[in-house]
Amino acid sequence: MAVVSLSEMMEAGAHFGHQTRRWNPKMSKYIYCARNGVHIIDLVKTALCMNNAYKWTRNAAKGGKRFLFVGTKKQASDVVAQEATRCGAAYVNQRWLGGMLTNWTTMKARIERLKDLERMESSGSIAMRPKKEAAVLRRELERLQKYLGGLKGMRRLPDVVVLVDQRRETNAVLEARKLDISLVSMLDTNCDPDLCEVPIPCNDDAVRSVQLILGRLADAINEGRKASNNEKN
């Protein structure tokens, strides 16, 4: 049984690629045709890739692997946070800060700083400071929450990065590959499938398409973790 049906993908607009002049030739095997100057993705192949991605992700979760969802474009931001939270994964949905993976020691210290500031705010410690100092601390807290809030539960580097729009998240791709971290990537027709272990050819711009794909991957992670817990018990 398919993880995601052709009708679901059609309704979500998962088959719409980019303009033909913006394509990456390496995506040709996933393209069905071109209409009105736009590439149409072969959803039969997307369904096969999703079956593979679901199985791969489920097995990774069952094996105790840690996941990081990354998608910083506006239309993906809320979905990334929602689905990552639902399956207990870390996420980056605002801006990829250089060194988030390759300079993990420094990034981890910034996350601890965020936690400290949150404790200070909730305890009323910041409110007791002089007005100017309190304002500075709250601005720092707001900035750290915006960019690092989704990483608070990430104590170590992830084993798998799940990407929305591989082309946009170039720095995340480079850092993950440098550290041999596996990539599960939603790939539009302008992407390079050779850069990831688990490709999912689909429209990475439409909110419903992103919701559909990330939702299934989150399901796979939850299912894998549940299977792992059942085996332990």
From Swiss-Prot:
Pfam hit, one: Ribosomal_S2
Sample GO molecular function, one term: structural constituent of ribosome
Disulphide-bridged cysteine pairs: none
UniProt keyword annotations, A-Z: Ribonucleoprotein, Ribosomal protein
Key word Ribonucleoprotein present: yes
Ribonucleoprotein as UniProt keyword: yes
GO CC terms in record: cytosolic small ribosomal subunit
InterPro entries xref list: Ribosomal_uS2 (IPR001865), Ribosomal_uS2_bac/mit/plastid (IPR005706), Ribosomal_uS2_CS (IPR018130), Ribosomal_uS2_flav_dom_sf (IPR023591)
GO BP term, example: translation
Sequence similarity: Belongs to the universal ribosomal protein uS2 family.
NCBIfam families membership: rpsB_bact
PANTHER family for the chain: 30S RIBOSOMAL PROTEIN S2 PROKARYOTIC AND ORGANELLAR, SMALL RIBOSOMAL SUBUNIT PROTEIN US2M
Name of this protein: Small ribosomal subunit protein uS2
Organism of provenance: Prochlorococcus marinus (strain MIT 9312)
Lineage: Bacteria, Bacillati, Cyanobacteriota, Cyanophyceae, Synechococcales
